[in-house]
């Protein structure tokens, strides 16, 4: 029995050494230490031994079993390490190979224009205010001097979610909310950039979703001349230092008086061309003095405080600045269009 156990140990150790992979090693494990293996058979046959032989053979069988188990574990660790090394060698990166340059990204032209406008007004002491795109009817209309049934509401077809909730049609609600937060105390000096929504049919100059930037200043002794000076400064920084602006009478329910603002054509210098349609002027935004009703509804004393407001579309500014003839180009994600602005 002793010779048999010693022979089994020697055979098992030799086969463990010869195993070239984990599968072969597992076959050796099952062959020698499995339920039907020779070591197990020896242990089962110990009942036939004499009482004197039984402890000696039992101890030897356990030693042989432990020796084989230890050899299996050592060989398994070695084979696993070899597999890791082979995998690392196969996946090695040759750092001497020339790298692939990362493709250079760029800002969308609308993002460029919006950030440029924001920077201009921040430089003039304005802060950026934001508000919800899903807005209450009150802030979108009533707080801006557009009560229910007002005929001017027909100027904007709106996306209503419920009777009192809609997608905002302009960023003016942000002005109303900001004034309300000030609780009747000035000054207020903000710009409000953001997305707006109207039920327009998409074409070269209209989109159901577009962006607006509106500005608001409320304080004591604010005059029309302050509005004109602000917009002249904006036009010169945005379109060139020689630009002039002009006001044309207009109507907006939330301002009185209201004006359309034109800038002298930056393509022809005001002499007349196809861009300005021969007039020498290009319309860029609407503006006016804040209506007293709007001030009062926001909690301001209209006899003490005055203010001006203006609103522009970054899409129109970008179309004029970069010579883009169709607003839909901004939203189609056409790489041929967008890659033109890498160095703009």
Curated annotation (Swiss-Prot):
Cofactor note: Binds 2 magnesium ions per tetramer.
GO terms, molecular function: ATP binding; catalytic activity, acting on a protein; magnesium ion binding; phenylalanine-tRNA ligase activity; transferase activity; tRNA binding
Cofactor: Mg(2+)
Compartments it resides in: Cytoplasm
Gene3D superfamilies in UniProt: Bira Bifunctional Protein, Domain 2
Organism superkingdom: Bacteria
UniProt keywords, alphabetically: Aminoacyl-tRNA synthetase, ATP-binding, Cytoplasm, Ligase, Magnesium, Metal-binding, Nucleotide-binding, Protein biosynthesis
PROSITE patterns per UniProt: AA_TRNA_LIGASE_II
UniProt-listed Enzyme Commission number(s): 6.1.1.20
CC terms in the record's Gene Ontology section: cytoplasm
Reaction(s) the record says it catalyses: tRNA(Phe) + L-phenylalanine + ATP = L-phenylalanyl-tRNA(Phe) + AMP + diphosphate + H(+)
Enzyme class, UniProt record, top EC level: ligase
Swiss-Prot/TrEMBL GO biological process terms: phenylalanyl-tRNA aminoacylation
UniProt cross-references to InterPro entries, sorted A to Z: aa-tRNA-synth_II, aa-tRNA-synth_II/BPL/LPL, Phe-tRNA-synth_IIc_asu, Phe-tRNA_ligase_II_N, Phe_tRNA_ligase_alpha1_bac, Phenylalanyl-tRNA_Synthase, tRNA-bd_arm
Binding, Mg(2+): 256
Pfam families: Phe_tRNA-synt_N, tRNA-synt_2d
Family of this protein: Belongs to the class-II aminoacyl-tRNA synthetase family. Phe-tRNA synthetase alpha subunit type 1 subfamily.
Subunit-level organization: Tetramer of two alpha and two beta subunits.
Protein name: Phenylalanine--tRNA ligase alpha subunit
Organism: Geobacillus sp. (strain WCH70)
Taxonomic path: Bacteria, Bacillati, Bacillota, Bacilli, Bacillales
Gene name linked to the record: pheS
């Amino acid at each position: 029995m002793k010779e048999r156990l010693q022979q089994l140990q020697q055979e098992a150790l030799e086969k463990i050494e010869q195993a070239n992979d984990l599968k072969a090693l597992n076959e050796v494990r099952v062959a020698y230490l499995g339920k039907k293996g020779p070591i197990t058979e020896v242990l089962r046959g110990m009942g036939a031994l004499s009482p004197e032989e039984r402890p000696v053979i039992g101890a030897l069988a356990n030693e042989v079993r432990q020796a084989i188990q230890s050899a299996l574990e050592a060989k398994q660790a070695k084979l696993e390490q070899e597999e890791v090394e082979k995998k690392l060698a196969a996946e090695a990166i040759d750092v001497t190979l020339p790298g692939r340059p990362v493709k250079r990204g760029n800002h969308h032209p609308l993002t460029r224009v919006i950030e440029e406008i924001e920077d201009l007004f921040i430089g003039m002491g304005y802060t950026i205010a934001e508000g919800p795109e899903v807005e209450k009817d009150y802030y979108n209309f009533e707080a801006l001097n557009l009560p229910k049934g007002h005929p001017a509401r027909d100027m904007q077809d709106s996306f209503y979610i419920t009777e009192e909730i809609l997608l905002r049609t302009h960023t003016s609600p942000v002005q109303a909310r900001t004034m309300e937060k000030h609780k009747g105390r000035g000054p207020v000096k903000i710009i409000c950039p953001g997305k707006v929504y109207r039920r327009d049919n998409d074409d070269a100059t209209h989109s159901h979703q577009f962006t607006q930037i509106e500005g608001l200043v409320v304080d004591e002794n604010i005059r029309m001349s302050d509005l004109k000076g602000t917009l002249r400064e904006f036009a010169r920084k945005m379109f060139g230092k020689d630009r002039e602006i002009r006001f044309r009478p207009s109507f907006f329910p939330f301002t009185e008086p209201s004006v359309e603002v034109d800038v002298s054509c930056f393509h022809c210098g005001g002499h007349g061309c196809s861009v300005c349609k021969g007039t020498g002027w290009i319309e860029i935004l609407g503006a006016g003095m804040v209506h007293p009703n709007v001030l009062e509804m926001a909690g301001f004393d209209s006899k003490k405080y005055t203010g001006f407001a203006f609103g522009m579309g970054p899409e129109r500014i970008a179309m004029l600045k970069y010579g883009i003839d169709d607003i839909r180009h901004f939203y189609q994600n056409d790489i041929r269009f967008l890659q033109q602005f890498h160095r703009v």
